[in-house]
A protein has these predicted regions:
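Patatin-like phospholipase
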Residues: 15-81, 89-295
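Bacterial Sec-dependent N-terminal signal peptides
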Residues: 1-22
Length: 295
């Protein structure tokens, strides 16, 4: 009231001689900020999503991601293997579920996963086409020793596809996969040591390619002294990665296909896939026991 009277009756004197500074006392602590609300803010549980391998069946994991979005459930961490790594890696790098679904439906997977010569015939010179037409089997030699390929295909088309998609993503490793929209881990197997190798930094495309490298079908991804292939050999459902980092809720998605019948094993890579399926059965069951939710 006194201040109001001074302003009304002695404005000139007041403003010429007095500087009024008002400093409201503000407590920046979380407790003080929340004290005016009739409820307390609670820290939400951290959610980890674990995606298994499973070949084409891995595309069903897109539906799981859609369900998370539909119910507004945030995902804090993704650890994945093989096809799950491709789906999870694209999502972690900023792709929407609609965009991933569009890729799954519109990509010519027969071409991307082709086991034939990687160079398209339309890209060859005439003499190369003639040589290809005359060749039934091509064997390379190193000196006098024949060079036996490590796999049926180099997998270059798959590498190119993954490189293109990750380059177009909104988020990129810098260099850690923690820098992506969602923290991400790709699980692989070192063909030399037999150990599980968890990739958490570097080239995302290379990590996805390594995790999805089916033995005998695609060449291993060489990284340092390692030769990386499908992580499903040793850790198809890596729930332990989320448990180790202390996530509150672990959701595991198992899209692993069942074992093939005798009539379905007509090619070497189908036999190799069957062997992998047998090897993964018991570890899969143990891994799923560590999850809070299994889909």
């Amino acid at each position: 009231l006194t201040l109001l009277l001074l302003l009304l009756f002695q404005p000139a004197a007041f403003f010429s001689q007095t500087k009024l500074i008002i400093r409201p006392q503000v407590d920046d602590s979380l407790t003080a900020r929340n004290s005016c609300y009739p409820f307390k803010f609670q820290k939400r549980p951290r959610v980890a999503l674990i995606l298994s391998g499973g070949g084409a069946r891995g595309a069903t994991q897109i539906g799981v991601l859609k369900a998370f979005e539909r119910h507004n459930i945030p995902i804090d961490f993704i650890a994945a293997t093989s096809m799950g790594a491709i789906v999870g890696g694209l999502y972690a790098s900023g792709y929407t579920t609609t965009e991933i679904e569009s890729l799954a439906l519109n990509t010519n997977w027969d071409e991307v996963l082709s086991l034939t010569e990687d160079t398209k015939r339309t890209e060859l010179f005439v003499d190369q086409k003639l040589q290809e037409d005359r060749s039934f089997l091509v064997v390379r030699f190193e000196g006098l020793e024949p060079v036996i390929p490590a796999a049926v295909s180099s997998g270059q088309r798959l590498t190119d596809f993954l490189s293109t998609q990750t380059l177009q993503a909104l988020y990129h490793p810098n260099p850690s996969f923690n820098d992506l929209k969602v923290r991400f881990r790709a699980v692989t197997t070192d063909l030399i040591s037999g150990k599980r190798i968890v990739l958490d930094r570097g080239s995302l495309a290379e990590a996805l390619r390594a995790s999805a490298t089916v033995p005998l079908v695609f060449n291993p991804v060489k990284k340092d002294s390692m030769q990386l292939i499908d992580g499903g050999l040793v850790s198809n459902i890596p729930t332990d990665l989320a448990k180790k980092e202390g996530y509150d809720i672990i959701v595991a998605v198992n899209s692993t296909s069942g074992l093939r019948s005798a009539d379905e094993m007509k090619a070497p890579w189908q036999t190799a896939d069957q062997i992998m399926g047998i090897m993964m059965q018991q570890p899969n069951e143990a891994s799923m026991k560590e999850a809070d939710v299994v889909i």
